[in-house]
């Protein structure tokens, strides 16, 4: 064969890319495309090379073009689509990745496309659909990836023992894979088998997945509320893997919660100084500083990031919202234009574009962006939350159908569980148990709490009889709330009505008088959200300004004319249920009293018996 033979040139370029010689691969495929510019294998390989070079936009364009060109066998077309799906998922485009993985499976039954689709669905908090996708795999074709994903999907739907059983039935060949042991450690921890979980994870510390093992061991210690040992694992992690973004972020977050409000982000700053090109570390720093209330420092970090990466959509979009919130409309518009030019198909960018438009009073643009978001992700809570704001700002009464608290929210005063004389007596005992868990000094850097503490509760592994009684107590009111939903396939809350539900998250929040509050927020990964009041200070019971009450409808952005639409007065034993896309907040309240609550998110289950 001549060296000008396209097949030989393609093989040479493939070989160079596999060997990590991206420069040679790029030059080879460029010569090949001069000879055959519309040959699908060459176009697709050029996309893979562009991905290796870090040019994700060009990589996507080339991969999509290779799918559009004629003459590709169905099995090869499936592989091309699978590669594009992996690119989109890794770049943060889950909705687009889902569509492309499904395109791959329409072309041919490709196990890696099926596992890629399942992983994407799990990341979008759609475990029931992920289970359906995984169960369609022919036995033995998915390998350890399918086994681990199936276990994770079962765990997310509340089938904890079934998730464990999947792993115990794994083949002998799977036992040599670290992904198996990481999954096993997580499943054992969720079942409360902490000693066995640690035994599964510790051997991984000497292998190539030591960073993942340290994160898993940290999660295990946090599950046990052993904060100091969790801190030890994270500090060891950043010592060995200083450029690992998740380890650095987790360490900063835990140090903040343990009371280090001054130096918690120093580790990230040091790594950015050493490696200015680390975009992910810069983004993590911006997020941490913003959630710590250090807005000016966060803005400075974002501007430095944009200077390092001119035109970067993420830094630009964040800065656009920051400028909009601080009455700098011209800068906000310039930043969001940059972000939209770079990533018009990214949900995060469209969300910030909607916010900037709302603050600026550009209501038609806000309606356009929010329509795009809800069309793209019909179950996306952020899109619907912003949509309701846009409709309200436009004076469109359709917002009431979606988010009027009188239609979609409910509060109920619960009866005590069996064995308790009154709801007050039950909550006094429950409050004592919860207080014992609130041993941190500050709020997490990823939630809405400010000047308070928030501690996770894990229904699946919870052994405290009072908390088990709480979960039993809320089962009926949740079921009644779901049963009361009318059939409406177009409604973001009602369309997901199912005969069963699962608790997808649960936590307790402690606020003290003076400064403790919740900033207005939604729950992006929920369906039904909640607040249950365990202890309520006298100062807020009849407060004239409703300080300390749960408010609905007021956004966290300065949008003209949009104030709270309703309030729930806290009372011991009262449960509030509402859509996860409903904006809600708690203002600070006077005095020194304690406001202690439990909150949870519920997600629908397509089939099964449901419950916590």
Predicted regions and their residues:
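Catalytic core of non-heme Fe(II) oxygenases with the double-stranded beta-helix
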Residues: 461-475, 479-577, 582-612
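Non-heme Fe(II)/2-oxoglutarate
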Residues: 401-495
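Start-of-helix register in tetratricopeptide repeats
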Residues: 7, 41, 75-79, 112, ...
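Short coil turns that delineate tetratricopeptide repeat
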Residues: 37, 71, 75, 108-109, ...
């Amino acid at each position: 064969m001549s060296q000008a033979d396209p097949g030989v040139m393609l093989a040479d370029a493939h070989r160079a890319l596999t060997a990590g010689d991206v420069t040679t691969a790029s030059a080879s495929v460029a010569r090949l495309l001069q000879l055959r510019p519309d040959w699908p294998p060459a176009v697709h390989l050029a996309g893979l090379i562009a991905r290796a070079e870090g040019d994700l936009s060009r990589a996507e364009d080339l991969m999509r073009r290779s799918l559009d060109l004629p003459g590709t066998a169905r099995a090869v077309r499936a592989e091309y689509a699978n590669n594009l799906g992996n690119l989109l998922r890794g770049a943060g485009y889950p909705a687009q990745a889902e569509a492309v993985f499904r395109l791959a499976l329409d072309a041919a039954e490709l196990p890696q496309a099926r596992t890629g689709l399942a992983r994407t669905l799990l990341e979008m908090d759609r475990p029931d659909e992920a289970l359906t996708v995984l169960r369609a795999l022919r036995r033995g074709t998915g390998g350890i990836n399918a086994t681990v994903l199936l276990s994770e999907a079962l765990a997310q739907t509340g089938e904890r023992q079934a998730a464990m059983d999947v792993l115990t039935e794994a083949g002998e060949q799977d036992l040599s894979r670290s992904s198996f042991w990481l999954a096993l450690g997580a499943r054992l921890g969720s079942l409360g088998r902490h000693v066995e979980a640690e035994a599964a994870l510790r051997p991984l510390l000497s292998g190539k997945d030591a960073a993942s093992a340290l994160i898993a061991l940290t999660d295990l210690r946090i599950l046990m509320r052993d904060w100091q040992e969790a801190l030890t694992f994270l500090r060891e992690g950043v010592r060995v893997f200083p450029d690992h973004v998740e380890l650095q972020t987790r360490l900063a977050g835990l140090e903040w919660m343990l009371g280090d409000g001054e130096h918690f982000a120093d580790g990230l700053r040091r790594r950015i100084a050493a490696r200015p090109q680390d975009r992910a570390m810069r983004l993590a720093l911006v997020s941490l500083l913003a959630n710590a209330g250090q807005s000016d420092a966060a803005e400075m970090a974002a501007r430095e990031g944009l200077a390092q990466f001119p035109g970067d959509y993420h830094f630009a979009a964040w800065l656009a919202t920051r400028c909009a919130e601080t009455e700098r409309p011209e800068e906000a518009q310039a930043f969001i234009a940059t972000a939209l030019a770079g990533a018009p198909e990214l949900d995060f960018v469209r969300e910030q574009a909607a916010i900037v438009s709302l603050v600026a009073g550009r209501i038609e643009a806000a309606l356009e962006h929010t329509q795009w978001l809800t069309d793209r992700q019909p179950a996306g809570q952020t899109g619907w939350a912003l949509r309701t704001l846009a409709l309200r700002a436009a004076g469109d009464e359709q917002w009431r159908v979606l988010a009027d608290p009188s239609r979609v929210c409910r509060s109920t005063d619960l009866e005590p569980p069996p064995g308790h004389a009154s709801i007050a007596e039950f909550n006094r005992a429950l409050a004592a148990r919860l207080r014992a868990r609130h041993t941190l000094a500050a709020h997490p850097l990823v939630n809405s709490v400010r000047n308070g503490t928030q501690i996770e509760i894990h229904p699946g592994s919870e052994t405290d009889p009072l908390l088990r009684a709480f979960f039993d107590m809320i089962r009926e009111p949740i079921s009644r709330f779901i049963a009361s939903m009318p059939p409406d396939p177009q409604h973001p809350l009602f369309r997901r009505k199912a005969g069963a539900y699962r608790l997808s998250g649960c936590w307790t929040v402690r606020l003290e008088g003076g400064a403790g509050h919740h900033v207005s927020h939604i729950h992006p990964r929920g369906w039904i959200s909640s607040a249950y009041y365990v202890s309520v200070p006298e100062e807020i019971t009849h407060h004239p300004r409703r300080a300390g009450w749960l408010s609905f409808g007021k956004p966290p952005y300065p949008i003209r004319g949009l104030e709270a639409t309703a309030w729930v007065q806290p009372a011991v034993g009262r449960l509030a249920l509402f859509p996860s896309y409903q904006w809600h907040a708690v203002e600070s309240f006077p005095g020194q009293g304690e406001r202690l609550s439990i909150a949870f998110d519920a997600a629908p289950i397509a089939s099964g018996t449901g419950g916590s």
